[in-house]
Amino acid sequence: MKQISIALLPCLCTLAGFAQNGKALDLKEIVSGKFTPKNISGVIPIPGDGEHYSQMNADRTQIIKYSFKTGKPVEVLFDAATARECTFKTFDSYSFAPDGSKLLIATETTPIYRHSYTAVHYIYSLKRNLDGKINNIVEKLSDGGPQQVPVFSPDGNQVAFVRDNNIFLVKLLYGNSESQVTEDGKQNEVLNGIPDWVYEEEFSFNRALEFSADSQMLAFIRFDEKDVPSYSFPLFAGQAPHFTPFEKYPGEYTYKYPKTGEVNSKVSVHTFDIKSKVTRKINVPVDADGYIPRIRFTQDPNKLAVMTLNRHQNRFDLYFADPRSTVAKLALRDESDTYIRENVFDNIVFYPENFSFVSEKSGYNHLYWYSIGGNLLKQVTAGQYEVQEFLGYDPEEGSFYFSSNEESPMRSAIYKIDRKGKKTRLSSQAGTNSAQFSANMKYYMNRYSNLDTPTVITLNDNTGKTLATLMDNAALKQEISGYDMPRKEFFTFQTSDGTTLNGWMMKPADFSA
């Protein structure tokens, strides 16, 4: 029988387990952020370079390269103050080309919904001159206006993006020449390459646009929402932020919002041949009221993965489609008596000859290994526990890396299973662990905390050996020890149907009942 973890009361933070022998908590101190653990965010492993990761500085003016072995800075990859032809002083985010040769830098970011936004993007080449120094020139991606979801081609020589619900393509080797791929995009009618509101909200993604492995094809999902009912709400001036246009009269925002029982967008998958400029519709057998929550090219340029769900979201199908012939063949089907969790989509990772898949078909969430043809080769994990996240596969060692709650539903740990099936726990501390691996799977950054320990961030090799401690929040732990903190109490109980539930409750430090 599955175990389900529940939280019965809200928590101040994970520091609720310290001794009750000191000062009382003060509301001003709580809301000031005084007890918030320090963290390291925005870490991006550098593609094609298994030894380093990158991070932008606190001022959002630089992108710095760090060593996975030591955690020490190695080089400043980008500096807005010194880059040539750079017209911005700060930036909001960035991403690498798949081969690590270029950066895509986002500025003037404007949020749309939970995951979506527009931004003005710039290209920065990391190509080095004969003296070993980076070329150091910034180029604007497009002069046509802000962009959504820009994505590099695998060879790093093209960028596709969406503007005003249409797809555009920029060829970087031809003076950043820009061409329009779709023409029918229109607000509240048709979206190309980006999901509508309900897809973005329910399936947690903001890009439905992919390049083929050989950089010769584009694939995208088209959302036709013309028949979806509209919903409107008023816009007021407000205070933070303040909108001047609505000071005297409120405005109105209208978008397509399908309530229960109403029609969703009609979705279809299309491909665009960059050389011939031919657009084709893929023949995917999706239900009329079904969903296409993801598309993704495999490492075979002639094999596009299309993922579908029925309206009840309890049947998942994975199709492999030929982007030119448009023929789609069913590779995998997974069904549930309840529903398919959305973490299935992003735990599917394609390798040259295989792909990973996570399913609850055994009663617990486990990792499976398939051939690229869709044949199940083996069940990688098994037992009465849940795989929480597939972290990657090392083809050289034949090893799988993942996080799971095998020790307890209240904990998470990092594990490795080698080609012989031997399982090794890599994280050494009991509590909550999460990991981010290097591009070559030789190193990882581990984030750990438990009831008595604020976040500790370490760098480790793939045997679990700690190479460096980046942050331990020791000062915060010492500070907290001087306060009367409420303490979490863990417990389990059984429901009337025999399901074991895990929970915790937190009482005031002076609670005596």
Task: Show the residue positions of the predicted features.
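Predominantly five- to eight-bladed beta-propeller fold
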Residues: 27, 33, 71-73, 108-113, ...
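Signature of short aromatic-glycine-proline-rich micro-motifs recurring in repeat-based ectodomains
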Residues: 38-44, 88-95, 194-214, 294-295, ...
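Non-catalytic accessory segments flanking enzyme active sites
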Residues: 41-44, 51-65, 74-77, 92, ...
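Residue-level detector of Asp-centered blade-edge/turn motifs that repeat once per structural unit
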Residues: 47-49, 98-99, 154-155, 213-214, ...
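Hydrophobic beta-strand positions that form the internal "hydrophobic ladder"
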Residues: 51-53, 103-104, 156-159, 215-218, ...
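Structural motif
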Residues: 60-65, 113-120, 164-170, 227-233, ...
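Blade-loop segments of beta-propeller domains
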Residues: 72-110, 137-146, 332-338, 384
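Asp-box/WD-like beta-propeller blade repeats and closely related beta-sheet repeat scaffolds
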Residues: 115-168, 174-208
